[in-house]
Amino acid sequence: GFPGEKGPSGEAGTAGPPGTPGPQGLLGAPGILGLPGSRGERGLPGVAGALGEPGPLGIAGPPGARGPPGAVGSPGVNGAPGEAGRDGNPGSDGPPGRDGQPGHKGERGYPGNAGPVGAAGAPGPQGSVGPTGKHGNRGEPGPAGSIGPVGAAGPRGPSGPQGIRGDKGEPGDKGPRGLPGIKGHNGLQGLPGLAGQHGDQGAPGAVGPAGPRGPAGPTGPAGKDGRSGHPGTVGPAGLRGSQGSQGPAGPPGPPGPPGPPGASGGGYDFGYDGDFYRADQPRSPPSLRPKDYEVDATLKSLNNQIETLLTPEGSRKNPARTCRDLRLSHPEWSSGYYWIDPNQGCTMDAIKVYCDFSTGETCIRAQPENISVKNWYKSSKAKKHVWLGETINGGTQFEYNVEGVTSKEMATQLAFMRLLANHASQNITYHCKNSIAYMDEETGNLNKAVILQGSNDVELVAEGNSRFTYTVLVDGCTKKTNEWGKTIIEYKTNKPSRLPFLDIAPLDIGGADQEFYVDVGPVCFK
């Protein structure tokens, strides 16, 4: 007979097996390594950024291993009858059917008109599973199945194009404390310590004959290093330097974790040979041209110069700006002599100073440190203050020069030290024989006290305005005993422009039995 009309659509089938995992996305090459920035303070955590746009579709990689079959989903709700599909291609001829029973031969009737389409019948009971049929033609795509489990990681794909530079990461956690360093050499002899408190005056002893001045004793052993002071407060952030030249590309980073399965993409011709991007083939090292060697050497030299600026060593070739900078860069170092360059110019005018890391001071020694013993001045005229640097012995001024640095260069460095400091201090020791330095025990006043001249021509006196008054730590020059004594004078100020001392003017001198000499202590800035 003639083929019947196409029947209504059947019920929706059960969910298909899970699809194969999508190809792995390409790993972007690491960004170009930037120059190290200046060390700033730890910032507050930023707000979470907005979700970025999805990246471009990666090149299709080889299919991953087939995942295990997912669990059978529950039957879906019956869908509405779909529209009649297009006529399918004729199927292949089936096997001949079995012979039926012979029917009664009827008379040939006339072809009848096509009847109306009947209503959809009720779904029949599910039949038993039939034998596996032959492979039919490819049907229309079915509905998307449920997402299967993540498949095993596929092989590493070829290197993708260079990615955009990522945001700066947050500073890492503080590393563990390093191992203690080896014991260093014995340090140089330290500066003279502060004198002790003035003791109670003893009973006057019998005046003995003045003995000859003994020879200088041997230098004692170096004292033990003091305890490290507390770390200083973090200084203000420095000015941002000019942008340096672009550094060389860093080495490839480690492979990232497998990405989520990508969407199935259509075929696309990229216009290049796939063998060029195979990651499992070793790359031959690039050949460097002569100019590449010159560029590489220049970049290494610039990197070394940047490292010396960030971490000064306190040497003549790599001086620090102040002792405080050296202390911040190397908190484990102990006090001693180091090279600094306060004006940050050419290192040829760097100066050698004593860095006291326990107090954070930068100390510069006077040259010379002492004025030798002598009957400096003889006069029978009226008593008055006489300046050592102007009148006595043709002028003997206090200098603060360092070997290899001119007086003009030293003056420039001292000017920068005053600008960088908030506090300054210095002491001077007046050795006397029958000369009053501070208080006259006979009269009980300070009329015979010495006067000191500061670096900005200010005169520092024993009494008066407290801003210009020095302090006496030890006063052993209060009366005439025909023996040597000493008076230690100290001046501290929050105006560094007033130091160092440039001159001293004693008053009680000029007699035949009067002698004195001076030890100028280091000036310390903080």
Curated annotation (Swiss-Prot):
Residues 293-526 form the Fibrillar collagen NC1 domain. Ca(2+) binds at D341, N343, Q344, C346, D349. It is found in: Secreted, Extracellular space, Extracellular matrix. Residues 9-36, 44-81, 110-131 have a biased composition (Low complexity). Residues 263-526 form a propeptide. One of its GO terms (cellular component) is extracellular region. Residues 249-261 have a biased composition (Pro residues). Residues 1-291 are annotated as: Disordered. It comes from the Eukaryota. Pfam families: COLFI, Collagen. Forms the fibrils of tendon, ligaments and bones. In bones the fibrils are mineralized with calcium hydroxyapatite. One of its GO terms (molecular function) is extracellular matrix structural constituent. Prolines at the third position of the tripeptide repeating unit (G-X-Y) are hydroxylated in some or all of the chains. Residues 165-176 have a biased composition (Basic and acidic residues). Keywords: Calcium, Collagen, Disulfide bond, Extracellular matrix, Hydroxylation, Metal-binding, Repeat, Secreted. Type I collagen is a member of group I collagen (fibrillar forming collagen). The C-terminal propeptide, also known as COLFI domain, have crucial roles in tissue growth and repair by controlling both the intracellular assembly of procollagen molecules and the extracellular assembly of collagen fibrils. It binds a calcium ion which is essential for its function. Belongs to the fibrillar collagen family. PANTHER family: COLLAGEN, COLLAGEN TYPE IX ALPHA 1 CHAIN. Trimers of one alpha 2(I) and two alpha 1(I) chains. Interacts (via C-terminus) with TMEM131 (via PapD-L domain); the interaction is direct and is involved in assembly and TRAPPIII ER-to-Golgi transport complex-dependent secretion of collagen. This is Collagen alpha-2(I) chain. The gene is COL1A2.
